[in-house]
Amino acid sequence: MDLAIQYPWFRRSLGSFYPSRLFDQFFGEGLFDYDLFPFFSSTISPYYRQSVFRNFLDSGISEVRSEKDRFMINLNVKHFSPEELSVKIVDDYVEIHGKHAERQEDQGRVSREFHRTYHLPSNLNESAIACSLSNEGLLTLCCPKTRPGDDSNWQDRPIPVSREEKQGTQPEIRADP
């Protein structure tokens, strides 16, 4: 009986064959060495690890944070302008939609579209929801929390997306009068 033996020094990532990379959003961008040869870097050094931070920023993955005093959603939408984004409240969910028409780029014609839906906690100050887009393409939705027991009655409405002028700032949270 033949047994397949994998030596510890030959541990390679499955690279583009691994299902988690199936929906990466790298359309129309340049290639890196590990995109062409995913096994090469880990074959030479089993201790080499690719940057998780780069993969997080470029993958379109969102981050949802529920802190003591506020609720935040961060989403990488670097391929979209504020005019191509739609953020709206529907029931107790926030829907984020981005779409731009087909356009010519260096590598060919590209069109992009996405839909994301997030459940909103019931203890948010609905009138103070703010949404902004940074220069780096990070969409930030921020909302302060109310006192425990104060539940929101969500009304369907659009949320305007503002463009941040400064790098690394978060949208202002308006105080309820």
From Swiss-Prot:
The modification N-acetylmethionine is found at M1. GO terms for cellular component: cytoplasm; nucleus. Disulfide bonds join C131-C142. Residues 146-177 are annotated as: Disordered. Glycans are attached at S162. Zn(2+) binds at H100, E102. InterPro entries: A-crystallin/Hsp20_dom, Alpha-crystallin/HSP_16, Alpha-crystallin/sHSP_animal, Alpha-crystallin_N, HSP20-like_chaperone. Heteropolymer composed of three CRYAA and one CRYAB subunits. Inter-subunit bridging via zinc ions enhances stability, which is crucial as there is no protein turn over in the lens. Can also form homodimers and homotetramers (dimers of dimers) which serve as the building blocks of homooligomers. This is Alpha-crystallin A chain. It comes from Squalus acanthias (Spiny dogfish).
